[in-house]
Amino acid sequence: LGINCAVTDLERVDDGKNEQLYYEGVRQGVELASGLQHALEYAVKHLPIPKVMTYQLADGVTTVSFVRPVRHLTALLGTEIVPVELFGLKSGRLTRGHRFHTSEPIAIENADSYVEQMKAAFVMPCYDERRAVIEAELKRRAAALDAEAIMPEDLLEEVTALTEWPVIYESQFESEFLAVPQECLILTMQLNQKYFALEDRSGKLMNRFLLVSQLIAKDGGKAISEGNARVVRARLADAKFF
C-alpha cells in the first residue's frame, strides 16, 4: 500500500453510504533537512514536464535535466537556512528578482518575508495571485474598450506560468483580416501568439486584442504593441491565404 502496512492493519468505517478503509498509526519523525531533501527530489522527479533540457553543472562534467537551468536554491525555516542540495546547488538565502527590472542579488531575511521581498524585486511568486491579477486586468482593459476578452482556461494557465510580473497591453490588426472566419483568427491568436481576442457586446470579433507581457515599458507599451501587431499581421496573412 506504500505505507508499509498490511491489509490486516486497516480499519473499516461506514458513513452510511460507503464503506471505507483507513490506516491509523504513529511514525517516527525525521529531521527537517532530510525530509525536505526527499520531498524536493520526489517533487522534481514527478513534475509533469513534457520537454526538458540537459545542461552541464559548474564542474563542467556533471549533467542534469530540467525545464530550464536552475541558478539558485533558497530554503529557509524562519531565519535559518535548511541545508538541502538540488541540481548541483546548495541551499542558501540568496536569489534574484526580475531579470530586466532588478540587477542585484536578494538576500531573503526570513521565510515569512520571501513573498514581499520578491514583489519588491518585481516577481510575484504566487501562481494564484498572478492569475487573479491577469484575469482582473484583462477584464478591466476589455471593459475600457466596451468589449469582452475571450479567456480560455488553458490559455490563462499558460500565460500565468510564463510570467513573473504580468502587465497587460493592447494591440490591433488591420480590419481587413476580419473577413477570415472568426474561429480561424481566434485560434491563430491563442495558439500561436498567446493573445486574448476581443469581442464587442454583440459577440462579433474585434480587430483588437490583449497580450500579457512581463515588462513595465517606459513608453507605456507602445513598442510592445507595435511589435506584436507586426507579428500577428504575418500570422493572420497566412491564415487568410490558406
Segments (PLM) and residue ranges:
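Function-dense linear segments that define catalytic or interfacial modules
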Residues: 197-242
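Long, basic N-terminal domains or extensions that often function
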Residues: 1-195, 199-204
